[in-house]
């Protein structure tokens, strides 16, 4: 397993841990709000890392691999949806941190993020390792 994949998995584990912590805490408490902000920063940093180090490698390989190109297209569309809904959630929290629908929204967003991480690790990570092992 490459160092990049190890780092990527570690970032995923940290994101999943913070998601779990927020779910276990009172989301309206000071600690819950602090964890939400930690989650937001972690997600932003992780997405930037993926955009700089992970997806360029896969996009280059997809130039000659139509199956991978199709898979990346679907993942990109999915990520656009998740990112938009996650940004909307954090805007809602910033504007009304005590909104009664915040806990339910967070559970929904958490499920989307967890599902995305699972799919990335089980599909894209394997593709990345396949591509980088050919070099």
Protein language model annotation of sequence segments:
Residues 1-135:
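Small-residue-biased structural context
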